[in-house]
Amino acid sequence: MKKIAIIFGGNSPEYTVSLASATSAIEALQSSPYDYDLSLIGIAPDAMDWYLYTGELENIRQDTWLLDTKHKQKIQPLFEGNGFWLSEEQQTLVPDVLFPIMHGKYGEDGSIQGLFELMKLPYVGCGVAGSALCMNKWLLHQAAAAIGVQSAPTILLTNQANQQEQIEAFIQTHGFPVFFKPNEAGSSKGITKVTCVEEIASALKEAFTYCSAVLLQKNIAGVEIGCGILGNDSLTVGACDAISLVDGFFDFEEKYQLISAKITVPAPLPETIETKVKEQAQLLYRSLGLKGLARIDFFVTERGELYLNEINTMPGFTSHSRYPAMMAAVGLSYQELLQKLLVLAKEEVK
């Protein structure tokens, strides 16, 4: 295994997150002792064009790579193990492994995984079904409930006529604060914490900007705890982390700028709670058929109750992101983590 295609960008609200994650991974792989032959494949934000990019890595980091016309050429995915067609060179590029470092829409929802299945090439991460299920929070919570993992009380809102009545009934039962969340979005995009009736309309509008279905969810007073898992059949469970906030919630700005948030790895949890988090995380991972990697997030209340929040099948992947930090805490360096993911991708097709 030598030829690796790193795939980044795409038509997603998390496009810039993909660029940051991909840049970190590329830097680490370029300096790896395994001497990889890397192909950098960027997908334009409109998702219409794919390019093989051979320019400076800094252009990817700064999102100027598309302007570097001298170092990009259009490519086209091919089916049946034939890799990609290079339009200018009139030849194919056939990587040993595809490594999609894409977040959110089209990157984590099973879309690009389905394409890779048609291409018949090994790829890093979860398959079509696992990716799609984890991206759809409503279905994820139904599946979790079926195996005994609870989530916060939630209803699904679409643009049906009785939407207002549903909202009023939910708030009457559960009170404020509540959260409005796009059913399919990542990095906390489109999520609003609502504390009064006057904030509902704008929160609903914001959430519907990202998805045609919206979750209305009860606030769980507790600490957000993450658990990283690596593997296919044999699993490596990373250290749990804990997120503490001065105010608000862990939104997009907090996730990537850490304005008032503090992330602690390992999380300062009682041993019984830590064990329970890791057991439920592994149960979800195996039951949902996840492969490669995932970060599974819970809320833990003062009484020690666990509530599933979400599952990220391609969590943020810079060298200082939460998932790599969880693995580093159990002795797996960033470079070793990348190598392991590539090996797992090849193992999955044997």
From Swiss-Prot:
Documented EC number(s): 6.3.2.35
Pfam families assigned: Dala_Dala_lig_C (PF07478), Dala_Dala_lig_N (PF01820)
Presence of keyword Protein transport: no
Residues involved in Mg(2+) 2 binding: 310, 312
Cellular compartments annotated: Cell membrane
Functional pathway: Cell wall biogenesis; peptidoglycan biosynthesis
Domain annotation ATP-grasp: ranges: 141-343
Cofactor: Mg(2+); Mn(2+)
Any one GO MF annotation of this record: ATP binding
Residues annotated as binding Mn(2+) 1: 297, 310
Activity regulation note: Inhibited by D-cycloserine.
One GO biological process term: peptidoglycan biosynthetic process
Binding site for Mn(2+) 2: 310, 312
Positions of the catalytic residues: 14, 187, 321
Coiled coil: none
Gene Ontology, cellular component aspect: cytosol; plasma membrane
Binding site for Mg(2+) 1: 297, 310
Catalysed reactions, as listed in the record: D-serine + D-alanine + ATP = D-alanyl-D-serine + ADP + phosphate + H(+)
UniProt topology in membrane: Peripheral membrane protein
UniProt-annotated binding residues for ATP: 171-226
Subunit record text: Homodimer.
Function summary: Required for low-level resistance to the glycopeptide antibiotic vancomycin. D-alanine--D-alanine ligase of altered specificity, which catalyzes synthesis of D-Ala-D-Ser; produces a peptidoglycan which does not terminate in D-alanine but in D-serine, thus probably reducing affinity for vancomycin. Only insignificant catalytic synthesis of D-Ala-D-Ala in vitro.
Protein family (similarity comment): Belongs to the D-alanine--D-alanine ligase family.
Miscellaneous comment in the UniProt entry for this protein: There is about a 400-fold difference in catalytic efficiency of VanC2 for using D-serine over D-alanine.
The name this protein goes by in its record: Vancomycin C-type resistance protein VanC2
Native organism: Enterococcus casseliflavus (Enterococcus flavescens)
Lineage: Bacteria, Bacillati, Bacillota, Bacilli, Lactobacillales
Gene responsible for this protein: vanC2
